[in-house]
């Protein structure tokens, strides 16, 4: 994914154009996505465009990756009134999560995983986080601590 907003918008427009063309042919179209289509999903941007053009577009809920990751680890995301913060680690925002009270799920950590590890070490909490870079995929890997 590019950080260039113009390029992203152009890509979303092109996807909506392609879907619209298929719908105009009377075809039924499915846009399958991993996780939930309403949580940091490319699909949401395409959905808005397709719906704005007057097409019927249905959202089918999925399992967000942070929920799938917690289940794979056998952990609760939060308990006893703890706050849960879902933070995208993109765009240099990784440091926001660990500073908040409660629990944090950092999403999209691929390019910032070393930054997250450094932040946790600075806070004296290097073993307090787990990483599932391939949650939901065949052969998903679980790193119980970010020190791995």
What are these regions (language model features)?
Residues 1-56:
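Class I S-adenosyl-L-methionine
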Residues 8, 24-29, 98-148:
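A contiguous loop/helix-start segment that scaffolds small-molecule binding in enzyme catalytic cores
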Residues 13-16, 91-92, 113:
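Structural motif corresponding to alpha-helix initiation and N-cap regions
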Residues 25, 38-100:
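Class I SAM-dependent methyltransferase SAM-binding "motif I" and its flanking Rossmann-like core
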């Amino acid at each position: 994914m590019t950080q260039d907003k113009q390029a992203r918008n152009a890509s979303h427009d092109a996807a909506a154009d392609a879907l619209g063309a298929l719908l105009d042919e009377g075809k039924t179209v499915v846009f399958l996505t991993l996780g939930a289509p309403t949580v940091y999903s490319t699909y949401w941007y395409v959905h808005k465009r397709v719906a704005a053009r007057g097409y019927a577009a249905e959202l089918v809920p999925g399992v967000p990756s942070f929920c799938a990751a917690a289940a794979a680890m056998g952990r609760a995301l939060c308990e006893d009134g703890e706050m849960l913060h879902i933070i995208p680690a993109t765009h240099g925002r990784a440091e926001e999560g660990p500073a908040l009270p409660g629990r944090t799920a950092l999403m999209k950590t691929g390019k910032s995983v070393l930054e997250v590890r450094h932040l946790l070490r600075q806070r004296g909490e290097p073993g307090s986080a787990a990483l599932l870079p391939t949650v939901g995929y065949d052969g998903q890997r679980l790193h119980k601590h970010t020190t791995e």
